[in-house]
Amino acid sequence: MYIPRAFNEDDLSTLHRQIEGTRLGILVTQGARGLLANHIPLLLSPEQGPYGTLYGHLAKANPQWQEMESGTEALLMFPGPDAYVSPSFYPSKAEHGQAVPTWNYLAVHAYGPAEVFHDAHRLRDLVRALTEKHEAGRATPWTLEDAPADYIDKMLGAIVGFAVPISRLEGKRKLTQNRNAPDIAGVRDGLAASSAPNDNEIARLMR
């Protein structure tokens, strides 16, 4: 990912927070079929390896897992909030007119060798952990035990798990850091006044 110095984010805990806060990640691999990409929920184990390890699963009918069996490098992308930045937000525009539209956003990219697994116990543990993560906070959280055991076994038999020990982690926080203080304040205030939740979140992050 292209990351100008002003927008680089390399604090591991900050990167991990964005990974864990992204409900749906993007898995990209390159193989005999060319580039393949899928949107899937991912689970981070932050203590496994220097940058953590990511876990997920794919349907057996999805050909991407076959490309991953050889240990091919995987790219996992975690997009954060984003916002269109209008030149009209910049006070400096009134002075010299030298302003164009841009975009503010957060993104994390994780790279590492993929490992595919079929073990039923390991798959069950992964699905349980993902379920507990996304059911947390509900009044009556769903658990694997809420469904018939044979049905869960059937569902587990239709998926393949994978792990990606992270070997490289990149983070980008593009929040108008390359502008002067009045322009930064103008963008922040302009986004805060928007009715779009993503705009408001970017404004909050700029404080």
Where in the sequence are the language-model features?
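Binding-site signature for planar aromatic cofactors or substrates
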Residues: M1-R207
